[in-house]
Amino acid sequence: MDLIFSTATFHWIKDHDRLFRRLAQALKPQGRLVAQCGSKDNIARTRNAMEQVMGEGRFPKFFTGLEDPWNLAAAKTTKARLEAAGFGEVNTWLHEEPTEFDSMDELARFLKTVMLGHHLERLPESEREHFAAMVAARLAQRGELVVDYVRLNILAKREVAT
């Protein structure tokens, strides 16, 4: 394979060392990896709001033992993992990409459909809308209707021998 392209996927994969080894094995020598995923700082405010709401009122019992669904790595850590997997000419950098919403309802719908699935599946159906609305309200306390994306961009070339 000459090129592997990925967007918004790597942060869902728990074992990045294995992932990068497999990608290096799939590429021809000098093949390129171009990817973007969530970084260590991705949705930090949003995750904080989720954690606060999970710990309030009737919600804690539903989230006992919940594992974080994301593997959000730092640029430096990702670079080291890629190099260890057989990539050279590795370039990793962060890009802030805040996503703004026009209304609290729009933000809550986005959270419910895009970000909170792993959390909502633990809740009774009757609690899901309320949970998403509470997370949205917690985010809005700073006067902004924003999800704070910080993307990790990756460019790498497979070394001749892996």
How does the language model describe each region?
Residues 67-162:
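Conserved Class I S-adenosyl-L-methionine
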Residues 8-9:
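Short catalytic micro-motifs in class I SAM-dependent methyltransferases
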Residues 13-23:
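A short, conserved alpha-helix within the catalytic core of class I
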Residues 17-18, 28-102:
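Conserved catalytic/acceptor-binding region of the Class I
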Residues 5:
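A conserved beta-strand element that flanks and buttresses the S-adenosyl-L-methionine
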Residues 22-25, 158:
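A short helix-coil junction within the Rossmann-fold of NAD(P)-dependent oxidoreductases
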Residues 2:
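Conserved acidic residues
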